[in-house]
């Protein structure tokens, strides 16, 4: 078996043993599933293309999504390439969102700086954290808006100077010190930086870089990570004054710095966690009664201090089974401390703005269930 086949086999071992919707796959079944898509002989195996990797996952009942770091085009004389994800979120950030969600991601590598070099395949199943979160901002309001190509700008006048309101966002991924990697020729559970992908101690060991990755998703997860990120950040921007009001209630003053964390999870696990970690009866009743789709994207936010204490100040819940259309159509609830909005399946978009005050804790538990488990 080649590296791609080994990694697909172990990913399907995970899905088949954990979820009743999937089953494990034999090497012979993997061979049969790509027979119709191959124009060359399959034995002896030369490995799988990215499209064939995705096809195997499709045959196993998953709905994979492929991300390429670079794309090629013909300029009429030569084939040229360009980086696809130059704006927020970038290629590595998208990868992190899926890893943060506890999804095993199939990563395709190429020898660094050599287009004709060796290819390789690994699986990423988690990440390690630094002791203290750094302040590498995603950007101030004007920066992350321009990176997202958003044309709308919210300005205030200060004497003769026009300035942006400042809301500094820090991605939780800047606190990542490395990723947990499974590689078929070395010891498992290695923690590697994405900038240092070597799998041998030899002096002439090949150094790899990521060329693409395949995310095996549940078939009804229609919202991609980059869309969930854009909606969440845009909503934070539109809700700037409400967010600041919540920060002020918690005794925080400018400059406002928020750590955001984005992940995909099941509504069942999310509701169970929120109910079990609730402090007040009102909180338990609220989370037990809200209607949620099977899968949701959650964007948590808090300060660097609350983040390190595994607490948050607010969260945005998005419908992961919806496609990206209008910003508010996928928003289910927004909680900012003890202020919360909720829009049911049949409610209009205007309900996203309908805030209600509930006797709930202003700081509440960071979600740590059914995605990545902490190993101390």
How does the language model describe each region?
Residues 128-376:
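Noncatalytic regulatory segments and standalone regulatory/sensor domains
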Residues 5-15, 104, 122, 183, ...:
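Generic ordered-secondary-structure signal
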Residues 19-29, 49-52, 87-93, 165, ...:
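General structural signal for secondary-structure boundaries
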Residues 1-79, 302, 323-326:
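Cysteine-nucleophile protease catalytic domains, especially the papain-like/related folds used
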